[in-house]
């Protein structure tokens, strides 16, 4: 892949890679479309061939343990945007949630198979499906609005 990108980049620039820094090559924009062709559109499709494990609800989990797990899962999302939104939300609200609300939060962050869906629902880009449209989602949407203009450049400290 690197040789393809390098040779394609050199061919487009009409040059060789000798003397170029990796930074120059890495930041150059290479179009995979031919001359006069439009680039392929970006389509948000789920790959049905990849099996996604179904979330198994943890029965009889003590509330304190559940909140500890949810704090960890809120911080380790795999995408920066949700990591920041959910970790700051959890730091602010998780301790004060009762058992029912904690279960709703657990369902919200673990049942959707695509983290981008959670982000789009919370930011209002996509409508929230009925099964996730509850008081916790409303709290998250208000948190995302950031009415107090809090700085959220990194995840809050754990303790």
UniProtKB/Swiss-Prot annotation:
One Pfam family per UniProt: Sdh5
Main location: mitochondrion
Top-rank taxon: Eukaryota
Cellular component aspect of the GO annotation: mitochondrial matrix; mitochondrion
A GO BP entry: mitochondrial respiratory chain complex II assembly
Transit peptide as recorded in UniProt: 1-14
Gene3D superfamilies membership: Flavinator of succinate dehydrogenase
Location in or out of the cell: Mitochondrion matrix
Keywords: Chaperone, Mitochondrion, Transit peptide
Assembly behavior: Interacts with the flavoprotein subunit within the SDH catalytic dimer.
Described function: Plays an essential role in the assembly of succinate dehydrogenase (SDH), an enzyme complex (also referred to as respiratory complex II) that is a component of both the tricarboxylic acid (TCA) cycle and the mitochondrial electron transport chain, and which couples the oxidation of succinate to fumarate with the reduction of ubiquinone (coenzyme Q) to ubiquinol. Required for flavinylation (covalent attachment of FAD) of the flavoprotein subunit of the SDH catalytic dimer.
Annotated family: Belongs to the SDHAF2 family.
Matching PANTHER family: PROTEIN EMI5 HOMOLOG, MITOCHONDRIAL, SUCCINATE DEHYDROGENASE ASSEMBLY FACTOR 2, MITOCHONDRIAL
The protein, known as: Succinate dehydrogenase assembly factor 2, mitochondrial
Species of provenance: Culex quinquefasciatus (Southern house mosquito)
């Amino acid at each position: 892949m690197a040789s393809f990108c390098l040779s394609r980049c050199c061919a487009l620039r009409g040059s060789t890679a000798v003397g170029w820094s990796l930074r120059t090559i890495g930041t150059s924009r290479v179009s995979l479309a031919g001359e006069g062709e439009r680039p392929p559109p970006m389509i948000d499709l789920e790959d049905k061939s990849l099996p996604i494990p179904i979330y198994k609800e943890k029965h009889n989990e003590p509330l304190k343990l559940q909140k500890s797990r949810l704090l960890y899962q809120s911080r380790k999302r795999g995408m920066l945007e949700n990591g920041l939104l959910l970790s700051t939300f959890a730091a602010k609200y998780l301790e004060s949630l009762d058992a029912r609300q904690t279960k709703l939060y657990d369902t919200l962050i673990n049942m959707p198979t695509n983290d981008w869906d959670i982000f789009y629902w919370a930011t209002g880009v996509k409508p929230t499906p009925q099964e996730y449209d509850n008081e916790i989602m409303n709290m998250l949407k208000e948190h995302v609005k950031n009415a107090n203009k809090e700085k959220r450049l990194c995840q809050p400290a754990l303790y």
